[in-house]
């Protein structure tokens, strides 16, 4: 049985603004091999929900460059996951622009290739949204400055989980430290053995070099 918790929009916003113009060392940069936009927005969503979905193929998770769900980096895959997810992790519905809120997701497209770019709302200015993104990097850029033929808004309704996480991943993400459950467990075990009340630090992920071949499930831009 799942429990629903709110999506922390302020945490997602803080993360997005902190890493819009730089990269978090925990994650690869797919800019040159398909695009980093959905990878970046997935990181922002994680900062606001701290809950992944490890369902093979159809889930939403990142463990390593070779162990990640298509939805973590693919524009259409992310849309499919968010709008169809009935298990753990964030879930969303497509809404009108007037219903979109802070740190909801925007996807842009055209008539020939479909949707190709993922952005996150990080502010509001007059009659437009301010968005942040990777590939091309943008921080609080007016949505009105983009050229596109199609647009859709995904409102994050909440986050489902089976049991509360022992750790809040937001601080670890901001400090570019590991958020993997096994790392946290190892740290807790070490602290117990040493009979100390100090929590063991997260262990940074050791990322493998990404292949230069374009991933089929990566972004288009």
Model-inferred region functions:
Residues 54-57, 118, 143:
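Short, solvent-exposed loop/turn and secondary-structure capping segments
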Residues 10, 121, 149-150:
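A structural signal for short, hydrophobic beta-strand segments that form beta-sheets
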Residues 61-134:
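...with weaker cross-activation on analogous glycine-rich loops/strands in unrelated enzymes
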Residues 12-14, 129, 151:
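A broad, low-specificity signal marking well-ordered, structured residues that form hydrophobic/aromatic
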Residues 47, 51, 127, 137:
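Short loop/turn segments at secondary-structure transitions that flank enzyme active sites
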Residues 1-73:
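N-terminal capping segments
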């Amino acid at each position: 049985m799942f429990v629903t918790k709110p999506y922390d929009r302020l945490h997602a916003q803080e993360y997005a603004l902190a890493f819009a113009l730089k990269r978090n060392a925990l994650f690869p940069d797919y800019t040159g091999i398909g695009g980093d936009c959905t990878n970046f927005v997935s990181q922002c969503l994680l900062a606001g929900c701290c809950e992944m979905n490890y369902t093979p193929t159809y889930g939403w998770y990142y463990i390593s460059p070779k162990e990640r769900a298509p939805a973590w980096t693919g524009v259409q895959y992310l849309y499919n996951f968010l709008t169809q997810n009935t298990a753990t992790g964030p879930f969303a519905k497509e809404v009108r622009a007037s219903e979109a809120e802070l740190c909801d997701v925007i996807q842009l497209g055209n008539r020939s290739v479909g949707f190709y770019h993922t952005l996150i709302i990080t502010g509001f200015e007059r009659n437009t949204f301010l968005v942040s993104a990777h590939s091309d990097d943008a921080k609080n850029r007016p949505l009105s400055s983009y050229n596109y033929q199609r647009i859709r808004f995904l409102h994050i309704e909440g986050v489902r989980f089976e049991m509360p996480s022992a750790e809040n991943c937001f601080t670890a993400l901001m400090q570019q430290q590991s958020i993997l459950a096994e790392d946290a467990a190892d740290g807790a075990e070490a602290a117990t053995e040493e009979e100390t009340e100090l929590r063991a630090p997260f262990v940074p992920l050791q990322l493998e070099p990404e292949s230069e071949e374009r991933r089929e499930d990566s972004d288009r831009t």
